[in-house]
Amino acid sequence: MTALSRTPVFDAADTAALLDYPALLATLARTVADYAAGEIVSPERLVVPLQAGGVMLSMPSSAHDLAIHKLVNVCPGNAARGLPTILGQVIACDATTGEMRFVLDGPTVTGRRTAAVTALGVQALHGTPREILLIGTGKQAANHAEAFTALFPDARLHVRGSRAASAAEFCAAHRAHAPQLMPLDGDAIPDAIDVVVTLTTSRTPVYRDAAREGRLVVGVGAFTADAAEIAADTVRRSRLVVDDPAGARHEAGDLIVANVDWQQVASLADVLNGTFARGGPMLFKTVGCAAWDLAACRTARDALAAREQR
């Protein structure tokens, strides 16, 4: 029997069960601090072209306690083939011996840690939200609806899609896991909305409201330099925070298109350590990095250890 055959491999459902949102949020907060302190190595992701417009993404990261490698294939033509667009796994290894410890489902890790990073930013920059608007009706919106329900159970969740029907269908499909979900009534965003999260694949703005005190805007969907979900004027008039300063300079299209002064952009670590004082119109842009996948693997490792002690 090979070492690989002895390595536990968890599918999407089992991976989700290992990544409880409150535990993931707490581990992410510690990992953000470790990453900012230089205790985690997380190089820029390697992108390798596949056939028919697909790409293979290689994202390793290592710390004193764990090393991980996320390998994900994104194949846009898979929908027509009846296959998932995103396929991949995250391998967690002992940081000293290199032995493989377990393997998690890649898309599930990405989806849950992305939603948890958003929630961590909301908690740190805004506190407990009352009325949240999700713009988008795809998988990322579903992950965020589940995360917000777990972490902010008293908040009401509004959804706006490209069509009113898509928002209604999304709410009906996911209300069992997020009972506070409701379609936004009309296109205008009510003043009561205190957190807006953009979760689309649009390359042009889906959020154009003016920057305003008391409302946190979180940009999640845009991940290339020329794509922006949030209007440039809104970006320029907001106080800016990013999850990963290194990656944001290349991938945070909302900020790049707005031609922001990067010296004025704070990091999530700055917020968590008290260097950045919240207040005024604020915008939090996330681009993700392998260090956040490492946080997910730390969470899964701890969950597995807890199971063994029962």
UniProtKB/Swiss-Prot annotation:
This protein's GO CC annotations: cytoplasm
Function: Catalyzes the reduction of Delta(1)-pyrroline-2-carboxylate (Pyr2C) to L-proline, using NADPH as the electron donor. May be involved in a degradation pathway that converts trans-3-hydroxy-L-proline (t3LHyp) to L-proline.
SUPFAM superfamilies in the cross-refs: NAD(P)-binding Rossmann-fold domains
Keywords: NADP, Oxidoreductase
Protein's recorded name: Delta(1)-pyrroline-2-carboxylate reductase 1
Family listed: Belongs to the ornithine cyclodeaminase/mu-crystallin family.
Disulphide linkage map: none
Domain of life: Bacteria
Catalyzed chemical reaction(s): L-proline + NAD(+) = 1-pyrroline-2-carboxylate + NADH + H(+); L-proline + NADP(+) = 1-pyrroline-2-carboxylate + NADPH + H(+)
EC number: 1.5.1.49
Gene Ontology terms, MF aspect: oxidoreductase activity
Organism: Burkholderia multivorans (strain ATCC 17616 / 249)
Top-tier EC class: oxidoreductase
